């Protein structure tokens, strides 16, 4: 019965579509001829959706090699324009920065994933978004605010280093680096947000921590899931909306969890947390700083701020394990500028130029969000001489731009040294986006990654678990995780033994 209904609905949709095509006026047809080129294989109703493979950024890269630096595809009836060159990105976010400052509005509830009209990531461009961005810049990511959380970042770093030392104090031991980096990053964020630690041995059996870990795991799974109902709305009419139901349930559970956090902080003594600070702002401006606004900000920070830092640190360590000479050069820089009597600190990071080059090269090869967050023009515009109508989804394939041989010498190779002699231009290296919708948390993410990476290099010797190189295959998702969990062999460096014993209280 369901199959018959689906067939009838698709047949009806096809018929309506063909009538629309026949009745389209000539001006519309002339406008369509000025769109960026499209790949062959378009089909009625589904467009080019059947051509999309698991790793979207690679599929789009393949299209760009045949069609050029700007092309168009159809996800169902939705027009999507893909930009894959640094010069066109510069045009987009200088000439058309305001026009492209909008976000496509999802037809399903994604607020528990950080993409909603109440979050700085997903809000449409306008006064509301400007207020959210100002709030992020002045209250959440302000240098003084981040400096007030420095002790948390150092303490979580010390906990990770101590755990690794206890595992490997007798000699080389295999460690699950991904798990350690996840624990470091999520505990960092949640202590800043609400003075909570939800990962680690002491939180293993805590019910609240379990709820948070389950919600986070579900969120990361849902971000990588596709929703056919957004491409083919008719499927919703037929009840084929399993993902939408999962998102609705996840949003409800996330709202309940976050409301519990807010209520707990209202009842308790004021602390140096982001939740407490936002609640204090709510007292003076309750009409704006609603619980919904605060929840949207916090959820976006948790989802966007953690996963990107985790995958970047994991990719960096994977690349270093495959390039021991680069690892040794970074270690020598740390030994020279920091020494062996203390651990690297955040105030050292500006001096550690080669370490910064490693982070930049990692972000070049494996940008945490390879196609960035989509944009949507608020009016018709032209990009690269082609028409881009209002309401089009515009994707920037940062992954492709970062591997463009016209921009980068030997683009597929891991060469941090390239950044020692070249100036970074934002339209060529854009892991955090560009223009007014660029990621507001880029500075915090780089602090996380730089401190974690520097500490791992300074304190331990690292080797691969086998002679084979680390697998650099990419996993699926909105972010760019490794396909395989990173495991490595580590042992304490002899010259850091004294410091490691102090950190580990042994």
Swiss-Prot record:
InterPro entries for the chain: Cyt_P450 (IPR001128), Cyt_P450_CS (IPR017972), Cyt_P450_E_grp-I (IPR002401), Cyt_P450_sf (IPR036396), Plant_Cytochrome_P450_Monoox (IPR050651)
Tissues in which the protein is found: Expressed in seeds and leaves.
GO CC list: endoplasmic reticulum membrane
Keywords, in A-Z order: Endoplasmic reticulum, Heme, Iron, Membrane, Metal-binding, Monooxygenase, Oxidoreductase, Transmembrane, Transmembrane helix
UniProt keyword Membrane, yes or no: yes
UniProt membrane topology term: Single-pass membrane protein
Subcellular location: Endoplasmic reticulum membrane
Residue ranges crossing the lipid bilayer per the database entry: 3-23
Entry's EC annotation: 1.14.19.74
Residues that, per the record, bind heme: 439
CDD domains assigned to the protein according to its UniProt record, in alphabetical order: CYP81
First-tier enzyme category under EC: oxidoreductase
GO molecular function, one term: heme binding
Reactions this protein catalyses: (+)-piperitol + reduced [NADPH--hemoprotein reductase] + O2 = (+)-sesamin + oxidized [NADPH--hemoprotein reductase] + 2 H2O + H(+); (+)-pinoresinol + reduced [NADPH--hemoprotein reductase] + O2 = (+)-piperitol + oxidized [NADPH--hemoprotein reductase] + 2 H2O + H(+)
Cofactor names: heme
Primary location group: endoplasmic reticulum
Matching SUPFAM superfamilies: Cytochrome P450
Protein family per UniProt: Belongs to the cytochrome P450 family.
Primary role: Involved in the biosynthesis of (+)-sesamin, a furofuran class lignan. Functions in a dual catalytic mode. Catalyzes the synthesis of (+)-sesamin from (+)- pinoresinol by formation of two successive methylenedioxy bridges on (+)-pinoresinol and (+)-piperitol, respectively.
Protein name: (+)-piperitol/(+)-sesamin synthase CYP81Q1
Organism: Sesamum indicum
Encoding gene (name): CYP81Q1
């Amino acid at each position: 019965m369901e199959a018959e209904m689906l067939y009838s609905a698709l047949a009806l949709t096809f018929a309506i579509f063909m009538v629309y095509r026949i009745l389209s006026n000539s001006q519309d047809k002339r406008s369509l001829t000025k769109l960026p080129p499209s790949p062959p294989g378009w089909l009625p109703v589904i467009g080019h959706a059947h051509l999309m493979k698991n790793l979207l950024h690679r599929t789009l890269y393949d299209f760009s090699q045949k069609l050029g630096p700007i092309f168009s595809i159809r996800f169902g009836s939705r027009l999507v324009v893909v930009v894959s060159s640094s010069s066109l990105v510069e045009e987009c976010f200088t000439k058309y920065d305001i026009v492209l400052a909008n976000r496509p509005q999802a037809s399903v509830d994604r607020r528990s994933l950080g993409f909603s009209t109440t979050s700085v990531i997903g809000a449409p461009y306008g006064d509301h978004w400007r207020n959210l961005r100002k709030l992020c810049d002045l209250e959440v990511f302000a240098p003084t605010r981040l400096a007030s959380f420095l002790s948390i970042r150092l303490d979580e770093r010390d906990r990770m280093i101590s755990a690794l030392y206890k595992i490997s104090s007798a000699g080389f031991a295999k460690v699950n680096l991904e798990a350690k980096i996840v624990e470091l990053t999520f505990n960092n964020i949640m202590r800043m947000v609400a003075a909570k630690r939800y990962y680690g041995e002491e939180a293993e059996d805590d019910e609240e921590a379990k709820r948070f870990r389950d919600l986070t795991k579900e969120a990361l799974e849902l971000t990588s899931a596709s929703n056919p109902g957004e491409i083919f709305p008719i499927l919703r009419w037929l009840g084929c909306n399993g993902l939408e139901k999962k998102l609705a349930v996840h949003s409800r559970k996330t709202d309940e969890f976050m409301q519990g956090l807010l209520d707990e902080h209202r009842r308790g003594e004021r602390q140096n947390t982001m939740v407490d600070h936002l609640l204090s702002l709510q007292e003076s401006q309750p009409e704006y700083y609603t619980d919904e606004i605060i929840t949207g900000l916090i959820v976006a920070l948790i989802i966007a701020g953690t996963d990107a830092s985790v995958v970047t640190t994991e990719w960096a360590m994977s690349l270093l394990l495959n390039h021991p000479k680069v690892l040794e050069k970074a270690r020598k820089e740390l030994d020279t500028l920091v020494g062996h009597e203390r651990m690297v600190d955040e105030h050292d990071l500006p001096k550690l130029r080669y370490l910064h080059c490693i982070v930049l090269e990692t972000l070049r090869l494996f940008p945490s969000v390879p196609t960035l967050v989509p944009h949507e023009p608020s009016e018709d515009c032209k990009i690269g001489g082609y028409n881009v109508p209002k309401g089009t989804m515009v994707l920037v394939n940062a992954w492709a731009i970062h591997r463009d041989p016209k921009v980068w010498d030997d683009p597929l190779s891991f060469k941090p040294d390239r950044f020692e002699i070249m100036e970074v231009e934002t339209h060529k290296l854009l892991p955090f986006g560009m223009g007014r919708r660029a990621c507001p948390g880029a500075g915090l993410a780089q602090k996380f990654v730089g401190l974690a990476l520097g500490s791992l290099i300074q304190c331990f010797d690292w080797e691969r678990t086998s002679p084979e190189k680390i697998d650099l295959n990419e996993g699926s998702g909105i972010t760019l995780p490794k396909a395989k969990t990173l495991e490595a062999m580590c042992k304490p460096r002899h010259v850091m033994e004294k410091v490691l014993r102090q950190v580990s209280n042994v």
